[in-house]
Regions:
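Membrane-helix interface segments
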Residues: 1-4, 55-63, 87
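"…centered on the first transmembrane helix and the immediately adjacent amphipathic helix/loop
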Residues: 1-50
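Residue-level signature of the transmembrane alpha-helical core
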Residues: 10, 17, 39, 44, ...
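Alpha-helical transmembrane segments of multi-pass membrane proteins
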Residues: 15-20, 46-50, 66-74, 97, ...
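Transmembrane helix-loop junctions in multipass membrane proteins, especially transporters and channels
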Residues: 21-28, 54, 78, 82-86, ...
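Short, flexible micro-motifs
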Residues: 23, 40, 73, 84, ...
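Interfacial helix-loop-helix junctions of multi-pass membrane proteins
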Residues: 29-35, 73-95
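Membrane-interfacial alpha-helical segments at the cytosolic side of multi-pass membrane proteins
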Residues: 40-55, 59, 97-108
Length: 109
């Protein structure tokens, strides 16, 4: 079961990478909806891996990694010519990671 959950988590991370670099990603029908999408995507990603890894230092390492991924993907988007670099997206990704971690810690108590 754990192996399946781990594979699902990595598949979800791969989907985030794909959607971040695809030329025409799906767009929500409201202003700043993409920021909400970033927040929810990275929040769920962090929550998922916090569920799988209970040790705080392992969670911290994943959190740093997911934030770094979000930052790297924004720079990659800026280099594509079809997507744009946005600091607000990096902030939404980072906030999502922190919220996912915080919710996970709260539910664990």
């Amino acid at each position: 079961m754990r192996a399946a959950l781990l594979a699902g988590g990595w598949a979800y991370a791969a989907a985030i990478v794909f959607l971040s670099l695809t030329p025409n990603p799906p767009h929500p029908g409201f202003e700043h909806g993409d920021k909400l999408g970033h927040l929810l995507a990275y929040g769920l990603l962090m929550f998922w891996f916090c569920y799988l890894y209970r040790y705080r230092y392992t969670q911290l390492a994943y959190g740093i990694g997911w934030i770094a991924l979000g930052i790297a993907l924004e720079f990659a988007q800026g280099a594509t010519g079809t997507r744009s670099f946005e600091v607000a997206d990096m902030a939404a990704d980072s906030l999502g990671v922190l919220l996912g971690w915080g919710i996970s810690a709260t539910l664990r108590k």
